[in-house]
From Swiss-Prot:
It comes from Homo sapiens (Human). Gene3D superfamilies: Ubiquitin Conjugating Enzyme. SUPFAM superfamilies: UBC-like. Isoform 1 and isoform 2 interact with UBE2I/UBC9. Isoform 1 shows a greater interaction with NFKBIA and HIF1A as compared to isoform 2. Isoform 2 interacts with NCOA2 and NR3C1. SMART domains: RWD (SM00591). Its main location: nucleus. One of its GO terms (biological process) is positive regulation of protein sumoylation. Enhancer of SUMO conjugation. Via its interaction with UBE2I/UBC9, increases SUMO conjugation to proteins by promoting the binding of E1 and E2 enzymes, thioester linkage between SUMO and UBE2I/UBC9 and transfer of SUMO to specific target proteins which include HIF1A, PIAS, NFKBIA, NR3C1 and TOP1. Isoform 1 and isoform 2 positively regulate the NF-kappa-B signaling pathway by enhancing the sumoylation of NF-kappa-B inhibitor alpha (NFKBIA), promoting its stabilization which consequently leads to an increased inhibition of NF-kappa-B transcriptional activity. This is RWD domain-containing protein 3. Residues 7-114 form the RWD domain.
Length: 267
């Protein structure tokens, strides 16, 4: 990461220092940095509108535009799109220099004007844009498979922390050489978890050097159905036999999932 970008991130962290105002979602030498800022901007009738701004700074930023997404429970989807388009237009005038704080200040000062534009007033569906896609409401469930864990104790603690931070429930399951992570929660948070899992140095390689998880696969993802159990917590569990693992899935209403995806790992 270039030094000016590192400095910009440090400054942003210092500015947005209140609880939940600032959060780094992922860092990668190849994909850049993704972070979230929670702020407010003045709308109609001098009412403050809460905004969730997600920025993706590519590795060649600020020579290129950052990726931007907008989310607000008080704005429609059309309004979110218009706000984003205006923000990107403003970003074009700031190319080649750190711009995130300038963009946040600009949207705080100009949101009311943007919302007064006729094309932003139509539609009643609330805006739920996230880092890269629109999220559906309700709980989702995903099943991940890990090839191995060399630094198991440390790895498990990291997974538990991520699950807690992202308000995800489910199971980290060990059965012989099989390692599965079953997660349940908001789909946006599940995707954030996967970004962390793939971009953070969570394990060590054969020489003991810290490394990223390169051997993870998503076996299954779907919206939670009525027959699925709602997990109340995230737990780490070890099973001595396949039938114990199968019972865990059956109790959770995931018998078909076990048959289609887990059994294939045993063969």
């Amino acid at each position: 990461m270039a030094e000016p970008v590192q400095e910009e991130l440090s400054v942003l962290a210092a500015i947005f220092c209140r609880p939940h105002e600032w959060e780094v979602l992922s860092r990668s030498e190849t994909d850049g940095t993704v972070f979230r800022i929670h702020t407010k901007a003045e709308g109609f009738m001098d009412v403050d509108i809460p905004l969730e701004l997600v920025f993706h700074l590519p590795v060649n930023y600020p020579s290129c535009l950052p990726g931007i997404s907008i989310n607000s429970e008080q704005l429609t989807r059309a309004q979110c799109v218009t706000v984003k388009e205006n923000l990107l237009e403003q970003a074009e005038s700031l190319l080649s220099e750190p711009m995130v704080h300038e963009l946040v200040l600009w949207i705080q000062q100009n949101l009311r004007h943007i919302l007064s534009q006729p094309e932003t007033g139509s539609g009643s569906e609330k805006c739920t844009f996230s880092t890269s896609t629109t999220m559906d409401d309700g709980l989702w469930i995903t099943l991940l498979h890990l090839d191995h864990m060399r630094a198991k104790t440390k790895y498990v603690k990291i997974v538990e922390k991520w699950a807690s931070d992202l308000r995800l429930t489910g199971r980290l399951m060990f059965m012989g050489k099989i390692i599965l992570i079953l997660l349940q929660g908001d789909r946006n948070n599940l995707k954030e978890y996967l970004i962390l899992q793939k971009t953070s140095k969570v394990d060590v390689d054969s020489s003991g050097k810290k490394c990223k998880e390169k051997m993870i696969s998503v076996l299954f993802e779907t919206k939670v159905q009525t027959e699925h159990k709602r997990f109340l917590a995230f737990e780490v569990k070890e099973y001595s036999a396949l039938d114990e693992l199968q019972k865990e899935f059956e109790t959770a209403g995931l018998k078909k999932l076990f048959s289609e995806f887990v059994l294939a790992l045993v063969k």
